[in-house]
Amino acid sequence: MGLEKSFILFPLLILVLGWVQSSLGKESPAMKFERQHMDSTGSSSSSPTYCNQMMKRRNMTQGSCKPVNTFVHEPLVDVHAVCSQENVTCKNGQKNCYKSHSTLHITDCRLKGSSKYPNCQYQTSQQQKHIIVACEGNPSVPVHXDAXV
């Protein structure tokens, strides 16, 4: 009887361990936001190749070229604080977007018209704009960059 239980429990244990391992490897929406949009150092954001380098480094040119992306060059705590600022309607109609009170230093990356995967080439543009982010969770943190205005 003990051996029969082992044959039943062992596959169940393997399934549970597989599920735990796969869930540990998943990127949360907040982590994805940080990977795709945060660059607090902004060390070389003035370089014309900044977007080409960062889009590749942050895995936004795998399988296709992401057409538009914004990097924010402010401390993460300041970007998190936007989630408690002016509540605005998101582009998709949802009500969980927030607009920064002040303008922030950002870099706008736009895919050049002639650029095609796998050679993704971006136009780099430094700007000072308000950001609008979608926020979720408790505490509320940014999970999506909605716009820069």
UniProtKB/Swiss-Prot annotation:
GO cellular component, one term: extracellular region
Record localization: Secreted
Main subcellular location: secreted
Tissue: Pancreas.
Cysteine pairings via disulfide bonds: C51-C109, C65-C120, C83-C135, C90-C97
Keywords: Disulfide bond, Endonuclease, Glycoprotein, Hydrolase, Lyase, Nuclease, Secreted, Signal
Catalytic activities: an [RNA] containing cytidine + H2O = an [RNA]-3'-cytidine-3'-phosphate + a 5'-hydroxy-ribonucleotide-3'-[RNA]; an [RNA] containing uridine + H2O = an [RNA]-3'-uridine-3'-phosphate + a 5'-hydroxy-ribonucleotide-3'-[RNA]
The protein's enzyme class: lyase
Catalytic-site annotation from UniProt: H37 (proton acceptor), H144 (proton donor)
Gene Ontology MF annotations: lyase activity; nucleic acid binding; ribonuclease A activity
N-terminal signal peptide: 1-25
EC number, UniProt record: 4.6.1.18
GO biological process: defense response to Gram-positive bacterium
PANTHER family per the UniProt record, alphabetical: RIBONUCLEASE, RIBONUCLEASE PANCREATIC
Record family assignment: Belongs to the pancreatic ribonuclease family.
Function: Endonuclease that catalyzes the cleavage of RNA on the 3' side of pyrimidine nucleotides. Acts on single-stranded and double-stranded RNA.
The protein's name: Ribonuclease pancreatic
This protein's encoding gene: RNASE1
